[in-house]
Amino acid sequence: MVDAAGFESVAQCPRELHQMMAAAADGLGSIALDTTQLNMSVTDPTAWATAMNNLGMVPVGLPGQQLVSDSICVPGFDPGLNMMTGITPINPMIPGLGLVPPPPPTEVAVVKEIIHCKSCTLFPQNPNLPPPSTRERPPGCKTVFVGGLPENATEEIIQEVFEQCGDITAIRKSKKNFCHIRFAEEFMVDKAIYLSGYRMRLGSSTDKKDSGRLHVDFAQARDDFYEWECKQRMRAREERHRRKLEEDRLRPPSPPAIMHYSEHEAALLADKLKDDSKFSEAITVLLSWIERGEVNRRSANQFYSMVQSANSHVRRLMNEKATHEQEMEEAKENFKNALTGILTQFEQIVAVFNASTRQKAWDHFSKAQRKNIDIWRKHSEELRNAQSEQLMGIRREEEMEMSDDENCDSPTKKMRVDESALAAQAYALKEENDSLRWQLDAYRNEVELLKQEKEQLFRTEENLTKDQQLQFLQQTMQGMQQQLLAIQEELNNKKSELEQAKEEQSHTQALLKVLQEQLKGTKDLVETNGHSHEDANEINVLTVALVNQDRENNTEKRSQGLKSEKEALLIGIISTFLHVHPFGANIEYLWSYMQQLDSKISANEIEMLLMRLPRMFKQEFTGVGATLEKRWKLCAFEGIKTT
């Protein structure tokens, strides 16, 4: 028989039991039942057999073995069993029950220990019996079904037993010895399932109404399923939000919005086009404006100035390209030097191997050493040959490039160079002609625009000024037409000179062939008839003199034509420059502009050319004292009127 005083002593010290339950909740160990609080010994098999006989249970025959071990586990417990994704598996330990994680294997039957509460006692089932069965766990299950309760069990007793598993939110008790318990968290259900199979006895009574075998199982509840669905939807929203943030982070940035065209925005864009750092952004805006069709007669001048600013960056880009090409050439040179050094070291290594294979040193090596040296030598020679072929290929390419750049001294090549120079000058004049034609079209457009404005406005002072501008533009247009005709005549003259040079070349070649045949004939005559060498030398001298005289005449004619053509070209360029500068320009300004077109021209040459044409250019003095400055102006239109 179990001593009743022992249970009374357990009931009288709830503080010690509470401390034991709190210590068991930390998951670091287990606290067995304090044997000092019971009169019966935990290790006494006779006392356990007597107590189990009183309950109508078959006593466990484990003589001499401790029934409740210091470290006991939850049999067959899986922390991740039927639990939702995202919930961290926890240690299935019930506070106050003295339970710890299981070390023994599943094949060994684990003995549960007796659980004492204030109002009842829980006895474990026979460890030889199979564990109680459970149904499939519903998703988000927080509610358990508890059956086999004693008839006299109250909600307070049930709460006292199951509140050790966790916070209880609701208990629904039925009159048929079962109830439903809803916990605050899902992992608490696993702790409650552990109590399935325990026999519950109220107090120390042996009445059937005060005892019953507990059956704890999962229960379906709409509230649990609804909360589980809410959590799933919340996780899905979080996942979608996370994916959206990731897509936004990986998506390339959208291009900046392009503002609409206005005169103010056009002025700002013109300033940006002149800045190298903002050029790429500004050129995109300019392209979009032109594609949208913002160009009309009123905005044509602004767009022309912006296109001109864009064209001014071509020289900068070419300079950058030249810089990169220079860097590439330097890198090629460094690579070639490094390759030469590597090839030199390969030659030295191969020389070492060749010296090692000579009879004087080869006899002292073993067979294995000779084999290794032979393999190394062959490998080094293959690498040396490959490097040498690569270096020779680089040198071959450089020689081909140099041969393309070299100039031959033959007379036919000189004539070809002269022809190419004339063709280049003709092409330059053609480009200048096209440029003047485009300027003429621009002036015509301006004249038409002024005519339209004149028809729309009344005859006022502003109209009078516009009439003057119109007359001035007409005069300018006439002057440009005259310049265009003059340049066309020069172009035709150059074409005729080019044809004449070709004819002279063919004539010179024919003359050379004839003289060569005559020379050959004279040599034959000398050999056959025995003429003296002096006659042959005289013939050669006469031939060379004729050829040289012909060459000198051709070069004099060509140099005189080139000189007059250059002066005409300079006059046309200076006239165009001074025409767009109605207030005149000093000689330094003119020289800086012409220096960009011809780097060999000097300021003195320009000034002498201007002084030779007093009807086209005149010199004026502006300013007083230290600000006194000489300016050259275009007076060709005034000179035409006076003549």
From Swiss-Prot:
Enzyme class: oxidoreductase
Plastid listed as a keyword: no
A single Gene Ontology CC term: external side of plasma membrane
Tagged with keyword Cell membrane: yes
Keywords from the UniProt entry: Biological rhythms, Cell membrane, Coiled coil, Copper, Electron transport, Membrane, NAD, Oxidoreductase, Secreted, Transport
UniProt-annotated location(s): Cell membrane; Secreted, Extracellular space
Essential cofactor(s): Cu cation
Residue ranges constituting the RRM domain according to the UniProt record: 142-221
Gene Ontology terms, MF aspect: NADH dehydrogenase activity; protein disulfide isomerase activity; RNA binding
Pfam families reported in the protein's UniProt record: ENOX1 (PF23267), RRM_1 (PF00076)
PROSITE patterns tied to this protein: RRM
EC number: 1.-.-.-
Any GO BP: ultradian rhythm
Regulation of its activity: Not inhibited by the antitumor sulfonylurea LY181984, the vabilloid capsaicin, and retinoids.
Record InterPro entries: ENOX, ENOX1/2_dom, ENOX_RRM, Nucleotide-bd_a/b_plait_sf, RBD_domain_sf, RRM_dom
Coiled coil: 307-342, 425-521
Protein family: Belongs to the ENOX family.
Purpose: Probably acts as a terminal oxidase of plasma electron transport from cytosolic NAD(P)H via hydroquinones to acceptors at the cell surface. Hydroquinone oxidase activity alternates with a protein disulfide-thiol interchange/oxidoreductase activity which may control physical membrane displacements associated with vesicle budding or cell enlargement. The activities oscillate with a period length of 24 minutes and play a role in control of the ultradian cellular biological clock.
This protein's name: Ecto-NOX disulfide-thiol exchanger 1
